[in-house]
Amino acid sequence: MTKNFRFEKDSMGQIKVPSEALWGAQTQRSIINFSIGEELIPIELIYSLTVIKRAAAISNFKLGLINNVKKDLIIEACTEILDGKHDSQFPLKIWQTGSGTQTNMNINEVISNIAALKTNSGLGSHHPIHPNDDVNKSQSTNDTFPAAIQISVVTQIIKKLVPSIKELTKVLDSKSNKWKDLIKIGRTHFQDAVPISLGQEVSAWSKQLKDAEDALIISLNELCFLPLGGTAVGTGINCPKDFSKESIKSISEYTGLFFYKSKNHFSLMASHDRLAQVMGQIKILASALFKISNDIKILSSGPRSGIYELIIPKNEPGSSIMPGKVNPTQCEALSMVCTQVMGFEYAVSIANASGTLQMNEYKPLIGFNILTSIKLLNHAISNFRLKLVEGIQPNPKTIKANLENSLMLVTALVPKIGYEKAAEIANLAFNESINLKEATIKLGYLTANEFEDAINTNKMI
């Protein structure tokens, strides 16, 4: 037994810890007490907490609270974690304490034990770096964990999600420009409407995504104000003056992003309105993508019995029973991701509303849902672009046939003959299965030349 385990001690006594594990007693207790699901704390959140620990060590050294040796050992340990060398040492689930305390201690213990290995002091010795007294100095989970969520969300959106959106809109803009002169029938209420160019139709998708991106970036502004330094309840107990300012400066330098000290720590620890707001903008992005994917599904329906104005890439067989079938699978995958994100947003809203007094006790759930949404959308958008949008092509023959066969071209006659006569033409054409020109001449409202001059689709867009 002693071969596979070592004994570590915390304020509750001794506990067995796997002999090679870099975590300690409090992490092990969490593993035992919260055997729920498989959803781990996102590694991006672990890294952001590690950035905070690194910044805290620098600040504590500058303020004379730890010596140079301890500072360097903590920084070295943080560097190894941020390089991805110890990802397996963070095994905790999101289903734990609502403050994230066990994850904060998980990081504190791992940093302590990395330092112990470097100095041949033995795992679990808490020497020369103590997880609480050194790594966690001047901090509380209650200010570091929400700050880490904010840092990781801002970082992942700016460095991962926004570039994916930009790449997709770039491709859509290219398609829009290429198809600007390809006139097709527009549709409202799933019924024929007046003409529009395919380029104009695609431009709507691009603009919708650009607007969602802009709103998302704007929502990050308030998220850059961190509650670091508020410690337990926002008052800053046990946190020296200038610690927050110095730490946030180090965080900004390390991440290359601008973060600032919050003017009111209490609000950012008791509630997470700003995170909920960002999640709301992520949901709006998801709703835009959902709409675009549905449009493409409709326009590519067929190939013989649907609209079939767009031809999607043939990526894989679509059916196990129907040979030759090609399905809009990328649209379906993206739609499912968007559906999940919308559900996550609802959970974040409830979680944000459910905090009590000086603490919101749903932090791991909020962090997980937002970061998972960012990751899912990032991957789904890239896949959607590469496997569908870049290869999508128009079907000019079907587009032309649908346009010429539409009764709604009669709208162009309204300025010449009025609404009622135009409606009469459309009804006659439909009832007798003739075209608009034939119906117009039959009713004697216009000559053939007058009709041709009025029904010029190039003038309708």
From Swiss-Prot:
Homotetramer. One of its GO terms (molecular function) is fumarate hydratase activity. Belongs to the class-II fumarase/aspartase family. Fumarase subfamily. It is an enzyme of class 4 (lyase). HAMAP family: FumaraseC. The record marks 332 as: Important for catalytic activity. The lineage of its organism: Bacteria, Bacillati, Cyanobacteriota, Cyanophyceae, Synechococcales. It catalyses: (S)-malate = fumarate + H2O. Substrate binds at residues 99-101, 130-133, 140-142, 188, 320, 325-327. Pfam families: FumaraseC_C, Lyase_1. InterPro entries: Fum_hydII, Fumarase/histidase_N, Fumarase_C_C, Fumarate_lyase_CS, Fumarate_lyase_fam, Fumarate_lyase_N, L-Aspartase-like. It is found in: Cytoplasm. It comes from Prochlorococcus marinus subsp. pastoris (strain CCMP1986 / NIES-2087 / MED4). One of its GO terms (cellular component) is cytoplasm. One of its GO terms (biological process) is tricarboxylic acid cycle. SUPFAM superfamilies: L-aspartase-like (SSF48557). Coiled coil: none annotated. There are 2 substrate-binding sites: the catalytic A site, and the non-catalytic B site that may play a role in the transfer of substrate or product between the active site and the solvent. Alternatively, the B site may bind allosteric effectors. The gene is fumC. Its EC number is 4.2.1.2. This is Fumarate hydratase class II. The active site is at 189 (proton donor/acceptor), 319.
